[in-house]
Amino acid sequence: MTRIKRGYIARKRRTKIRLFVSSFRGAHSRLTRTITQQKMKALVSAHRDRDRKKRDFRGLWISRINAVIRGNPKVSYIYSNLIHSLYTRQLLLNRKIVAQIAILKENCLFMIANNIIKT
């Protein structure tokens, strides 16, 4: 078989991969075989963690809401009852917005909870 000299095409492909992994440590940014492996691993991790980030933030919002509601003796609510009553009253407040209200303006959250209790 004759030898195929790839010339600039292979070099172009490798330099493109090198630019992607240039910030990696050690051989992961220098050796061609490990560069391709680390690029694939990085892209897989990025894809996986985009979904994981959504899960983590939802859990964070839930724990923030629950901590603020349970911490106040004025309101006898727990998280699940609050969310259930929000849905039954058809209030369009998602967990992210309720968590921001809980952190920034606790009084508003307690006003919302008290109005839900009264009705």
Swiss-Prot record:
Organism: Phaseolus vulgaris (Kidney bean)
The protein's name: Large ribosomal subunit protein bL20c
One GO term describing the cellular component: chloroplast
Gene Ontology molecular-function annotations: rRNA binding; structural constituent of ribosome
Keywords, sorted A to Z: Chloroplast, Plastid, Ribonucleoprotein, Ribosomal protein, RNA-binding, rRNA-binding
InterPro entries (alphabetical): Ribosomal_bL20 (IPR005813), RIBOSOMAL_L20_CS (IPR049946), Ribosomal_protein_bL20_C (IPR035566)
Annotated family: Belongs to the bacterial ribosomal protein bL20 family.
PROSITE patterns to which the protein is assigned, alphabetical: RIBOSOMAL_L20 (PS00937)
Localization per Swiss-Prot or TrEMBL: Plastid, Chloroplast
HAMAP family the UniProt entry points to: Ribosomal_bL20
A Pfam family the protein falls into: Ribosomal_L20
Gene from which the chain derives: rpl20
GO biological process, alphabetically ordered: ribosomal large subunit assembly; translation
Coiled coil spans: none
Protein role: Binds directly to 23S ribosomal RNA and is necessary for the in vitro assembly process of the 50S ribosomal subunit. It is not involved in the protein synthesizing functions of that subunit.
